[in-house]
Regions:
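Short acidic-glycine-tyrosine-enriched beta hairpin
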Residues: 121-136
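Ligand-binding loop in jelly-roll beta-barrel domains
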Residues: 136-162
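A short, N-terminal "cap"/entry segment at the start of jelly-roll beta-barrel domains
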Residues: 19-83, 167-178
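Bacterial N-terminal signal peptides that target proteins for export
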Residues: 1-6
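Glycine- and acidic-residue-biased ligand/ion/polar-headgroup-sensing regions
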Residues: 104-106, 110-115, 120
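Short, charged/polar surface micro-motifs in flexible loops or helix N-caps
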Residues: 80-82, 92-94, 114
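C-terminal motif of bacterial Sec signal peptides marking the signal peptidase cleavage site
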Residues: 15-17
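Conserved short histidine dyad/triad with adjacent acidic residue
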Residues: 71-72, 87-101
Length: 178
C-alpha cells in the first residue's frame, strides 16, 4: 500500500510539473559549502525522535561521492518505513556517483535540470521534470549535464537497500570533454 501511495504521489508530482509552464525550480543546498577532495559518509547530526513523521536532513546520514555529489540517505529500517528508503542529492555540474548497482529497482525524481545517464548498455540524457526507472541489479551512473547544481531524489522499495560500487563513473570524462 505504501509503495502504491508513493508511486502515485511521484506520478502526480511529475504529471503536474510536466503540464505546468516551464519555471525555474529552487535548488536546495544540501552538501558542504566547499566540495571535499575525498568521498565520505557521516552519521546524522541529530537522532530522529521516536514517532516523528518528518525526517529532516540533519536526521539522515550524509555522504559525498567524489566528484560532485553530496546528499543524505534514509534507510527505511532506521526511520520506521516497512518497504522504502530514500536518497536526496545535491549534484554539481559534471558530478555524479560511481557506477554502481542495487539489488532492488530504483526510481529517480528530478524536478529541474538535465542528467545524463548510463543504465546497463544504454546512455541517454533526460531533461526534468521526470521519473527515471533503474532496474534491479543493473549497473548505472549519472552526471549533472547542466551548468548549475540540482537536487535528485532516489526512491528504493526496501527498508534496507544495498549499494555496490562497480567502477568509476564512465560519464565524468565524457561530460568534461564536451
Amino acid at each position: 500500500m505504501i509503495r502504491a501511495c508513493v508511486a502515485g504521489l511521484l506520478i502526480i508530482t511529475c504529471v503536474a510539473a510536466c503540464g505546468a509552464p516551464e519555471q525555474e525550480a529552487h535548488f536546495v543546498r544540501l552538501g558542504p559549502e566547499t566540495l571535499p577532495d575525498e568521498s565520505f559518509e557521516k552519521l546524522p547530526e541529530k537522532q530522529l525522535q521516536p514517532g516523528s513523521l518528518i525526517i529532516y536532513p540533519e536526521n539522515m546520514t550524509s555522504f559525498y561521492d567524489h566528484p560532485g555529489e553530496a546528499g543524505f540517505f534514509a534507510f527505511g529500517k532506521e526511520y520506521g518505513f516497512d518497504s522504502l528508503s530514500f536518497v536526496i542529492t545535491e549534484t554539481h555540474p559534471h558530478g555524479g556517483p560511481p557506477l554502481h548497482t542495487h539489488s532492488v529497482e530504483e526510481a529517480h525524481v528530478l524536478l529541474s535540470g538535465t542528467m545524463e545517464y548510463v543504465v546497463g548498455e544504454q546512455r541517454f540524457k533526460a531533461k526534468a521534470p521526470y521519473i527515471a526507472r533503474v532496474p534491479a541489479g543493473v549497473p548505472h551512473a549519472f552526471v549533472n549535464a547542466g551548468d548549475s547544481p540540482l537536487n535528485l531524489i532516489g526512491v528504493l522499495p526496501t527498508k534496507d537497500p544495498d549499494y555496490q560500487p562497480v567502477g568509476p563513473n564512465p560519464l565524468i570524462e565524457a561530460v568534461d570533454a564536451e
